[in-house]
Structure formats: structure tokens, C-alpha cells
């Protein structure tokens, strides 16, 4: 039987039927919709309930509406029923509108709902567009993954946006997203190796709270869409954006006043007290006349990644700190400082004053804690959304900072990391998912209410929090430094600039002019035997690549650990000139790069170059750091933009120290030319 969509168009090949998984003898299984199959699984503490284990399946239809009902399970009982509802769409896809289970007689909790699980065809060349970092195209070696194993899983933390896709050249690609109020819940997206050769499974996953009521009966509290389509990562991001921008929370976020952030030409991510952090800001503004935003780390009276959340007072004293803020602002700078809104040092003596009552706990009672600082060896425990003691400390801190004259604060780890299920028995919320997101949203809103007009930012974009933060830092223009892999297997793509454009400002990179990581004097004596200058000089292209890549993506430029020592270093003369030129180019082209719309990537031909990158960090000596290699990096980066008045242009940058030629095909308009070393070019389409 063929089904008609409500519009009257035939839903492409929408033949719905029950069938058994290849190689299995189950009496019930998935639902076929066209060329894909739709099923579910429910993960419990001990095992997984799968649709293939159910005793019967009935499928009913009404116009474009499909209802699948599975009944009976060997463990959950004969009365166990799972019902899924889908609405077929003209393109051959469907909206998953409802999923519910009931009648579970077994004493097992449902810890994860996975629906829909959409089995689609693939080839060995199929790539995955996944919502990690800024967006990523991952080209797996499918031979390395066993049937039913995750090939790629995104979330619950670091879920940059709510869609995923399987990409095919010359055949249909496959898109899956989360809609409705998914952002308020503990969710993930995954791609699994398929049940038969030549298949993969797109999965939406949800971790519900664990209660007696939800053990017996529960379901998905949101909807989403599966769609076959023609195209790649850009079309997938655009599809999700087309829904997101219709939501009231997106419209409210986009209506905010971003004018103060729009005036920024470059960010400086500084680490140190007043004597380290203030002079470079004045130097750059004097040299260029451009506005600098200082993202100030290590202003606090405690060692970094240690003794959180007791940041106050500043290490230069309250008066010295406030005087420095005033001097920078009087000369036109934007100033914000680092705070951590989500972690408490569980090895600090003050942990006993409320840490356990505030913390996220994993199943079994362990803290969700990590040691970042290898010198102090203190662990930071992640904090739940139900944490009045911790939140009270942070709220007072942010008030102190606003009263110090700052433009805003950065609240680390919330947007990227406040998504975990929590099982702390001291908390009033049900164990499991959803409590952390709801608690953190209320907490961040309270900070906003306490500090009207204060600009808040956090780490990474997420649909859960983007409407509460005006800005987000993303460091993945420094892809290799962050250890994210090499082309062609792992390719960063600027999907965030498609999904969030106009509703949240994105800034950031790890581009470090001198190349050396910073050292906090409060950690103690710096380790000996690290010949930094001799090592970092071996990576001459890294700074320009990292700085320019983000600008091309529409991310506000940032330099990391830029000090007056860099100004005096003759090795860096060309890099610092490129830094000035890049900030000026970004500022002069904000009608495209800040206000405009990122278009589908054009085709550009240019030479490639082998480039080595040093993956150094504060917690690893330079000589012990890893070198990442891009064997064939394009020497000209590019992106295409449409301004609000309809003008279209390509942004081009030659990050190398040699002149580079290029050929550009911009939607049928062909351009060619050359770009001098370390320079930018705006190529108008018409």
C-alpha cells in the first residue's frame, strides 16, 4: 500500500510493513518505510529490550499517519506494549510524533530510550555528519566496527546541535534530528553499524528519570524528523536550522542586542595577573585602533583548575583588579573574566562545606570528577543543577564581578557539560536524566536576573543553553592542537555558523603567537628542561592556520596567551602583522561575517601543503607534546556569505608565507587569481 501525505503528494516509496531482521528468527521486528526500517531499543541496567524480541507487531495507517504497536516481551511480560507514531512526509521521510511503552512488569528500569532507530543503506564511502565541536564530517573505516556497535555517538555532553546525518555522494543522504523540547532533556544522537552488511542505523537517544512510574510506563517527551535528502553537511545543518529558527526560544535569543559584541575586532585569551594581561590589550588597540575583547583567565586568587569555586578575591587585590578593568574599558576594551559555573574542587578542604550535597553522582555512588591539573593533582567534581550551596557562591561571585565594572563573565563548562544524568541520593530530583538541564537553566537565569545587562558566555554551543548565553567560545579552529584528527578522515565544518547565526555570538581559537603554553605561578616552580622557543619555532604555519580558519567560519577571532614578550620576539614579526590584518579584515567585513548568512561551500582549487601542528597545553611540557600532521592542507581557506542586503561574496585567506593561486566556482560564477602571503581577500560573486 502507498501512503499519501496530507498535501496529497505520494510519500516516496512509503510502503509500511513488518519484517524480521536478516539472520534472526524473531516473530516481530522493525517497520519498513520506503527503503528504510524503523525500530527501537530500551536500555536497562542489565540488558537491552529490542523490538526484535517483541512477540507481535501490528501496523495501522490513517492518511499519512502510521502507528506501530509491539506487544509482549519475554522479560517485561505479555502485557508490555510499545507504541510508536509517525507522520509520513512527501520527501519519503517522517516525523516521529510519539513513542510510549507501558505495562512493564519486570523490576528493571528504563535507563535509555532509543527511538527512532532508522536503518538505512550505506557504502564503504558513507561519511557521518555529527554534532561535535563546530560540526564534523567523519569518514569511518566501516570494517573496524562490529554489527550493533556505535560508530559515532554525540552527547549527552558536547552535543553542539540536535541533528546528525549519513552522507553519500551520488545517492540519498539520511538526516535525523531532535525537535520540540528535546533541548530540555538528557539526549544524544548516534550512528551504529547496521544489522546487515551495507547498512547503518541512525539513533535518537534519551535518558529519562528513574522512577517507579517511569519503570512501568514512559516515553519520549519530544519529537523529531527523519528525512532522506540530496546533499551533504550544509544541507543537513540548514534543515535543522529551518526548524530551529521558528521556535520561540530562537526568536527570543535572536532579538537580543548584540551591538556590544559586534564591535569586537579580536579577542585576547589571556592567562595571568594585571601585569601580564593588561599591556597587550593597550598595545594592540594603540597599534590598530580596533576594539579588543579580553577573556581574562588567572585573574583569580586561586591556582587555575584548583580550589574552584572560591575565585574571589582577585590575585592583584580588589582595588588593583578594578583599577585595571577601568583602565582597559576607558580606552575602549571589552573585558570579561573566567569563572567556572559547573565544577567544585573535591580535594579542597572546603569541599566538606557542601560539596557532596551539590555533586553529580554516577550510578553506584561515585563522583563525576576529573583531574585536569597534573601539577596540583586536584580533581574537579561536576555539579548538579540541584546545588543551592554551590550556586549561591557563584551568584555572589558574579555580582562581585559586575560591581567591578566588567562587561560580562564567562561561565565555563555549562553549555558543553551540564547534561549528565545524576544519581545523588541526597537530591530531591529523581535519579537519572533531565534534572541537571532544568536546574542549570534556572541557575543561569538567576545569574542573569541578578546582573541586568551583563553579557554571559559559556563553553561551546548547545540548544539547551544558547538562549541564556549571548556568546560561546569554540576552540576547534585549532583542530589539530585539540587532537581532533587529520584530513580526510576527520574534517571540521562550520555547521554552528549555519545553526546559530544571529542568535548567539561565537568566538575563539587556541592560536598562540609564541606557540608556548602559559604557566600559572601559583602552581609552583615551572618544570626545568623545556626549551620552548627552539621547539615551537618548528611549527611556523600553526598560528596563521588556527587564526584564519575560525574567521573564515564566521567565528570572531581570538589569540591565546599573547604577551608583550611576543611583541619583542623578532621571529613573530610577520605573525603579529597577520594578526593585525586579520582583525581588521574581520571588522571591516562584519556585514558578511557577523551579520550575514553562511552559504553552501563553493568549489575552490588551490595548492596544498604539508603542515605540522604542536598539540601543547598548560599541563604538558612542550618537548613532551604530540605533533599532528595534515598531509595536504589547502593553502587557501574560503567560505561564502550573503549580506542582509543580498550581496554575496567569498572570503579567501592565504595563510602560507608564499603567494598562492586559486580558482573559485561560486554557484556557476568562476573567479581566479592570486593572494599574497599571509593576506585576505574578499571576492564578490557579481
Model-flagged regions — what are they?
Residues 2-13:
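Bacterial N-terminal signal peptides that target proteins for export
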Residues 12-20:
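Bacterial N-terminal signal peptides
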Residues 22-24:
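Sec/Tat signal peptide C-region and signal peptidase I cleavage site
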Residues 26-298, 311-314, 327, 331-335, ...:
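Carbohydrate-recognition beta-sandwich/jelly-roll modules
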Residues 147-157, 171-172, 280-283, 293, ...:
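Polysaccharide-binding and catalytic clefts of secreted carbohydrate-active enzymes
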Residues 212-220, 397, 433-670, 676-677, ...:
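Active-site-proximal substrate-binding groove within the catalytic cores of carbohydrate-active enzymes
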Residues 262-362, 391-395, 435-445:
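Aromatic- and glycine-enriched glycan-recognition loops and surfaces
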Residues 320-322, 326-327, 334-404, 478-498:
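Active-site-adjacent "subsite" loops/lids of carbohydrate-active enzymes
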Amino acid at each position: 500500500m502507498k501512503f499519501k501525505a496530507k498535501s496529497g503528494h505520494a510519500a516516496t516509496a512509503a510502503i509500511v510493513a513488518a519484517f524480521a531482521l536478516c539472520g534472526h528468527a524473531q516473530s516481530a521486528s522493525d517497520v519498513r518505510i520506503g527503503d528504510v526500517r524503523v525500530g527501537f531499543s530500551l536500555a536497562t541496567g542489565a540488558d537491552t529490550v529490542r523490538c526484535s524480541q517483541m512477540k507481535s507487531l501490528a501496523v495501522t495507517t490513517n492518511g499519512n499517519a502510521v502507528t506501530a504497536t509491539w506487544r509482549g516481551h519475554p522479560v517485561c511480560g505479555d502485557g508490555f506494549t510499545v507504541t510508536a507514531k509517525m507522520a509520513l512526509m512527501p520527501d519519503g521521510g517522517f516525523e516521529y510524533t510519539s513513542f510510549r511503552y507501558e505495562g512493564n512488569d519486570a523490576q528493571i528500569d528504563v535507563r535509555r530510550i532509543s527511538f527512532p532507530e532508522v536503518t538505512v543503506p550505506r557504502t564503504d564511502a558513507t561519511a557521518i555528519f555529527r554534532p561535535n565541536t563546530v560540526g564534523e564530517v567523519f569518514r569511518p573505516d566501516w570494517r573496524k566496527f562490529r554489527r550493533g556497535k556505535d560508530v559515532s555517538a554525540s552527547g549527552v555532553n558536547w552535543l553542539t546541535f540536535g541533528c546528525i546525518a549519513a552522507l553519500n555522494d551520488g545517492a540519498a543522504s539520511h538526516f535525523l534530528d531532535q525537535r520540540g523540547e528535546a533541548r530540555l532533556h538528557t539526549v544524544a544522537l548516534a550512528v551504529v553499524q547496521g544489522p546487515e552488511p551495507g547498512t547503518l542505523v541512525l539513533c535518537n537517544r534519551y535518558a529519562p528519570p528513574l522512577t517507579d512510574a517511569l519503570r512501568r510506563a514512559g516515553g519520549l517527551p519530544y519529537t523529531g524528523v527523519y528525512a532522506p535528502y540530496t546533499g551533504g553537511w550544509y544541507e543537513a545543518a540548514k534543515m535543522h536550522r529551518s526548524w530551529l529558527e521558528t521556535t520561540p526560544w530562537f526568536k527570543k535569543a535572536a532579538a537580543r542586542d548584540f551591538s556590544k559584541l559586534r564591535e569586537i575586532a579580536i579577542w585576547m585569551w589571556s592567562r595571568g595577573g594585571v601585569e601580564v594581561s593588561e599591556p597587550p590589550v593597550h598595545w594592540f588597540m594603540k597599534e590598530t585602533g580596533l576594539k579588543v575583547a579580553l577573556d581574562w583567565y588567572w585573574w583569580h586568587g586561586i591556582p587555575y583548575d584548583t580550589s574552584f569555586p572560591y575565585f574571589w578575591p582577585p590575585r592583584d587585590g580588589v582595588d588593583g583588579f578594578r583599577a585595571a578593568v577601568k583602565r582597559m574599558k576607558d580606552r575602549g576594551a571589552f573585558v570579561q573574566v573566567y569563572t567556572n559555573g559547573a565544577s567544585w574542587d573535591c580535594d579542597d578542604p572546603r569541599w566538606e562545606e557542601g560539596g557532596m550535597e551539590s555533586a553529580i553522582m554516577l550510578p553506584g555512588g561515585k563522583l563525576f570528577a576529573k583531574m585536569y591539573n597534573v601539577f596540583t593533582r586536584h580533581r574537579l567534581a561536576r555539579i548538579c543543577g540541584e546545588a543551592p550551596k554551590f550556586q549561591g557562591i557563584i551568584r555572589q561571585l558574579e555580582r562581585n564581578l559586575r560591581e567591578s565594572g566588567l562587561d560580562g563573565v564567562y561561565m565555563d563548562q555549562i553549555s558543553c557539560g551540564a547534561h549528565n544524568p545524576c544519581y545523588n541520593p541526597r537530591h530531591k530530583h529523581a535519579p537519572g536524566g533531565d534534572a541537571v538541564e532544568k536546574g542549570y537553566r534556572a541557575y543561569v537565569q538567576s545569574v542573569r536576573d541578578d546582573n541586568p545587562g551583563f553579557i554571559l558566555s559559556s563553553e561551546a554551543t548547545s540548544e539547551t543553553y544558547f538562549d541564556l548565553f549571548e556568546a560561546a567560545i569554540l576552540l576547534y579552529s585549532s583542530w589539530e592542537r585539540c587532537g581532533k584528527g587529520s584530513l580526510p578522515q576527520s574534517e571540521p565544518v562550520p555547521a554552528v555558523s549555519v545553526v546559530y547565526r544571529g542568535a548567539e555570538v561565537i568566538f575563539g581559537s587556541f592560536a598562540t603567537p609564541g606557540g608556548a603554553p602559559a604557566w600559572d605561578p601559583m602552581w609552583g616552580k615551572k618544570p626545568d628542561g623545556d626549551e620552548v622557543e627552539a621547539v615551537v619555532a618548528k611549527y611556523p604555519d600553526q598560528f596563521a592556520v588556527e587564526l584564519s580558519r575560525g574567521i573564515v567560519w564566521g567565528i570572531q577571532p581570538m589569540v591565546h596567551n599573547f604577551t608583550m614578550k611576543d611583541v619583542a620576539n623578532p621571529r613573530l614579526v610577520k605573525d603579529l602583522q597577520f594578526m593585525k590584518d586579520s582583525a581588521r579584515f574581520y571588522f571591516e567585513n562584519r556585514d558578511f561575517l557577523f551579520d550575514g548568512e553562511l552559504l553552501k561551500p563553493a568549489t575552490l582549487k588551490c595548492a596544498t601543503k604539508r603542515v605540522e601542528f604542536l598539540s601543547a597545553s598548560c599541563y604538558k611540557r612542550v618537548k613532551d607534546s604530540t605533533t599532528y600532521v595534515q598531509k595536504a592542507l589547502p593553502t587557501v581557506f574560503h567560505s561564502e556569505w550573503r549580506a542582509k542586503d543580498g550581496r554575496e561574496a567569498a572570503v579567501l585567506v592565504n595563510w602560507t608565507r608564499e603567494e598562492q593561486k586559486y580558482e573559485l566556482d561560486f554557484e556557476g560564477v568562476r573567479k581566479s587569481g592570486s593572494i599574497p602571503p599571509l593576506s585576505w581577500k574578499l571576492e564578490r560573486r557579481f
